[in-house]
């Protein structure tokens, strides 16, 4: 159910939990970045954290793309920090507003899908703008025999076209699967306690320990998926820039 409005026909405004948490994530990112951009001579911990995060992604982009990587840092860093904050905040165990329970917006296919489309729009734009039709040579191995080129080229093209889907599905599946596990074992806890029996209480305790374990793993997965998306984005852009 939406927090405000309804899905009835003719309703011009519907405010969902997904929209709420998107705004919360964006606000948290803004506060984090604003608080760490003071540029003090002796930086505090907050400034060190922000500068360290930017430096981490900057190094990743420069290593993956090369000297031209600086111009692509804004998008790679934006994707990285949005995924990181969205994934981590979706694991918060409390609600900020009534009816607005924690929600991982990246567990929705549309969010990761749009981010993937932006990445590949950049890849195609950079590739054709920089190299023209020579960009298509990316799909044809230079030193392969002519007979093999007709076989390898379609395979390389299909591999390239599949990349947006893999980029979409990786964070989506990782976060969605973890939340499904938490939901299932959370139900085990409730049902076990409601049974008022020794076996039921035992199941509840075991399920609770498993929930704690999965929650810790989810925090690691949240950071890993943000890193994987950023590094793959850098590598795909590198191929468009350097044609290799």
Model-derived regions, located:
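Selective transmembrane helix interface/packing segments
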Residues: 1-244
